[in-house]
Amino acid sequence: MQIFNTLTGRKETFCPRDPGRVSIYVCGPTTYNFIHLGNARALVVFDTIRRYFLYKGYRVLYIQNFTDVDDKIINRSREEGIDPQTLAAKYVDEYFVDADALNVRRADVHPKVSDHIPEIIALITMIIDRGLAYVAGGDVYFAVRKFGGYGRLSKRSLDDLLAGARVEVGEQKRDPLDFALWKAAKPGEPWWESPWGRGRPGWHIECSAMALKYLGTGFDIHGGGADLIFPHHENEIAQSEGATGEPFARYWIHNGFITIREEKMSKSLGNVFLVRELTRLYPPEALRLFLLSNHYRNPLDYDPEAMEASVRAVNRLKTCLGLLRESLDRPAPDGDGGGGNRLEAVLEVLQGRFEAAMDDDFNTALAQAVMFDLTHEVNTYLHQNDRPSRGALQKALDLFDAFNRVLGIFPEHKGRIVLEAGAVSGDLSQGLLDLLIALRQDARRNKDFATADRIRDGLRALGILLEDTPQGVRWKKT
């Protein structure tokens, strides 16, 4: 298995710290709002990476934190007029609603900053004792110039960093490059007692303390979005290795940005999309499929056309799965109309291609392509054989489930895909469906075939297939 390591700037063969086990720490959200599409990409990417290690037979210890002590939380709580910890707890709960919708599995541990203040204070004390941090007016700062190798993750020199560094009003740090490990208490902000007075931790030290507590030094993989490379992850390395004298994490994995019609997603442009909003517009399976549709290190551009394509793609997968299950459930004698052995041979090739794609730095775009090749092979086989081999079909279904256990497109129970039951998919009510069918019939009678086709195609994208028969219009789920 090859993994691109941001630290070295190249692909490396993965070799775990402990044979047969993988330790992963992923920076989770700051809980001051609902998660947006950029947050979701990181969640889905690293959930998929974890799933693939499990598929390969590894035992995985997966940690994803919640930053529930932060300036953004304090500012948002003032706007809403509630306590910062109440606000943070609210958005932790909301995170799980969105994560569940995207079929993101729970981490083994979801540590919160507020529950780990003693560990944070102990780590800061170690850094001070090693001469790499200093106290100034109740604040504690990391002395960047005293740590050799600072900048090696982000590939930045101290001179480059100094050009963009600044000292905020009220800060007492000795060097513009230094960063806060502990911040003295201010009126109206949460605080904890410490050897340096009342205060709260800086952002970067929080993740170091939690990662070291649950995974120890030299753990396997540290992940997050590319926006965290500097300063967050650079500072994590400095303070963690400064405290322990040992390597912090061995492989650093960063997912690329989400763009909106090739523009950066930002509040100022008004193009920040919340997962909660998008899952009301599109099936969550389609959103997850979209988030895995490009290599994780590359930018991923969002637009409605791309999402509609993902909806159609998910429906193709559902149709194939339905045909497989229907064929296996049908009370018919087993047969082989001349293709079962060939299909089984193709399945082996497809499994090899899928694993090769994921082994090559978790290339989910290629892995998805293999999954769609599987649907093509199954559809072709069923079309060409009146008496298909049940053994071959069962192997195809098993492979479909195996691919899904990695990509996580559909929810699963005991390793098998679970599709939601119901007369009509999504938020489409029976009454609305009847109305759309009636409008399409009116359009056809008026020879407005463009409108009729648009309604038909729109319903197909929502998982409803219309059939025109002499007895009238019939519909079925795809």
Swiss-Prot record:
The record's comment on cofactor binding reads: Binds 1 zinc ion per subunit.
Q: Which organism is it from?
A: Desulforudis audaxviator (strain MP104C)
- Source taxonomy lineage? Bacteria, Bacillati, Bacillota, Clostridia, Thermoanaerobacterales
Motif 'HIGH' region located where? 29-39
Q: Where is this motif: 'KMSKS' region?
A: 264-268
Catalysed reaction(s) here are: tRNA(Cys) + L-cysteine + ATP = L-cysteinyl-tRNA(Cys) + AMP + diphosphate
Q: Which Gene3D superfamilies match?
A: Cysteine-tRNA ligase, C-terminal anti-codon recognition domain, HUPs
Name of the protein in its database record:
Cysteine--tRNA ligase
Its primary localisation, in coarse terms, equals cytoplasm
Recorded hits in Pfam families, A to Z, give: CysS_C, DALR_2, tRNA-synt_1e
- Which SUPFAM superfamilies does the record match to this protein? Anticodon-binding domain of a subclass of class I aminoacyl-tRNA synthetases, Nucleotidylyl transferase
Which keywords belong to this entry?
Aminoacyl-tRNA synthetase, ATP-binding, Cytoplasm, Ligase, Metal-binding, Nucleotide-binding, Protein biosynthesis, Zinc
SMART domains, per the entry: DALR_2
Return the EC number: 6.1.1.16
